């Protein structure tokens, strides 16, 4: 069912035969790439690595592209221009630490993309409750009961699984989609996000945590996309900036007094300082 929904959305929104896919080693991007392939689109996969550090996501994207006979363009994101890149990210109104870290590689990917339409698996994580907080609350009845007791004890509002998921899709949340799209607009591309389609959302929001993730994380996708089996082990969810090492790279900016002008210990605080600084100056 999910495969058909993704295919239908791709067919209805992408008029060109060729499509770029930001491909990683995760279920979300692989599934939309397969859906595009099965919908008759010519897939051109793009993936990045930091300098000479080959990540799981990059290696798996290259492997899958080879097996599927997709064109694959590797993007090497430099690590020696970080201060200048920080200022570029500030101009894109990055606010949170994750905004800076997740938009950073896109500064180098989008200039290389040849196609008009760029396909991603954006938003899929929001349905599955793969965060630590979600799993502690919704992954089984015992954890739900513990969450209920905690809310009563601390006089907090208890969120249903759907309420928790809906919060993910708010305009200024959704894994920083708004900031990603600032880069998309700069390079005159069209960002296609099949997992944010209303038909896809309705289907997945009607599933509980167990239906979505048992016996394996994102099982409902794995079961529908049988081609995934030929790609070997597909690792569980890991955020882009963590799996690629971008977060570790950005921690080096703590030692840069020009960037870390308040002597902070965490990049979370440095990011906030810059957002406030720019907002005040505007």
List each language-model region with its residue ranges.
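RNA-binding accessory domains that recognize and position tRNA/RNA substrates
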Residues: 1-18
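Mid-to-C-terminal catalytic subdomains of enzymes
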Residues: 125-139, 171-263
């Amino acid at each position: 069912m999910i495969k058909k929904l993704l295919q239908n959305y791709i067919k209805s929104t992408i008029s060109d035969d060729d499509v770029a896919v930001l491909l990683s080693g995760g279920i979300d991007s692989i599934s939309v790439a397969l859906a595009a392939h099965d919908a008759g689109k010519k897939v051109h996969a793009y993936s990045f690595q930091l300098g000479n550090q080959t990540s799981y996501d990059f290696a798996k994207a290259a492997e899958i592209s080879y097996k599927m006979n997709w064109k694959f363009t590797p993007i090497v994101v430099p690590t020696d221009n970080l201060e200048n890149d920080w200022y570029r990210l500030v101009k894109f109104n990055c606010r949170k630490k994750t905004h800076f870290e997740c938009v950073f590689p896109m500064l180098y990917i989008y200039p290389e993309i040849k196609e008009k339409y760029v396909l991603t698996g954006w938003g899929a994580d929001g349905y599955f409750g793969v965060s630590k907080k979600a799993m502690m609350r919704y992954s089984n009845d015992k954890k739900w009961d513990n969450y209920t007791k905690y809310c009563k004890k601390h006089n907090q509002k208890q969120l249903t699984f759907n309420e928790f998921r809906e919060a993910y899709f708010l305009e200024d949340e959704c894994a920083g989609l708004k900031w990603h799209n600032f880069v998309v607009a700069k390079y005159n591309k069209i960002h296609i996000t099949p997992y944010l389609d209303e038909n896809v959302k309705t289907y997945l929001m009607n599933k509980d945590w167990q239906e979505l993730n048992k016996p394996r994380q994102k099982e409902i996708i794995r079961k529908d996309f049988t081609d995934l089996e030929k790609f070997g082990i597909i690792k569980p969810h890991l955020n882009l900036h963590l799996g690629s090492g971008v977060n570790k790279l950005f921690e080096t900016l703590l030692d840069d007094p020009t960037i870390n002008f308040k002597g902070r210990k965490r990049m979370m605080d440095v990011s906030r300082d810059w957002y406030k600084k720019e907002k005040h100056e505007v």
